[in-house]
């Protein structure tokens, strides 16, 4: 299986297919919303029959909190299961991330929140991506 960094980059490549969404394969130093970044949540070692690891990532999406209604509408588009801005749909369009994994599935939206990132408030949520 691919390395964690290769998988991060594969997920980030899928984020690149969403128009006007800034993205990075790691937690960024600077955010200009809307922005999505990839972080590893968990690795389960040797779970498949051939000894491969299963890795769970989260794609964190940040949108501007300047106008609450606009923020919620914008975030909802990224969290939807379908649509031009859907992160799940972008991952589903290439579930092998360019043939580097057996599967990558966006499974859960969680932890919708207002969060401070480098001192600025954003509306945010995580999309869990299971990879094997």
Predicted feature descriptions by range:
Residues 1-33, 39-132:
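Charged, amphipathic alpha-helical segments and their flanking helix caps
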């Amino acid at each position: 299986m691919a390395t964690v960094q290769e998988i991060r980059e594969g997920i980030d490549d899928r984020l690149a297919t969403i128009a006007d969404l800034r993205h990075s394969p790691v937690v960024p130093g600077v955010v200009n919303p809307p922005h999505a970044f990839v972080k590893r949540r968990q690795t389960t070692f040797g779970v498949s029959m051939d000894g491969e690891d299963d890795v769970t990532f989260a794609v964190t999406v940040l949108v501007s909190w300047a106008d609450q209604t606009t923020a919620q509408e914008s975030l909802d588009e990224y969290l939807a299961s379908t649509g031009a801005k859907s992160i799940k749909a972008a991952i589903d369009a290439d579930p092998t991330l360019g043939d580097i994994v057996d599967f990558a599935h966006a499974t859960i939206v969680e932890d919708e929140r207002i969060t401070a990132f480098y001192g600025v408030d954003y509306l945010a949520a995580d999309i869990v991506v299971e990879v094997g």
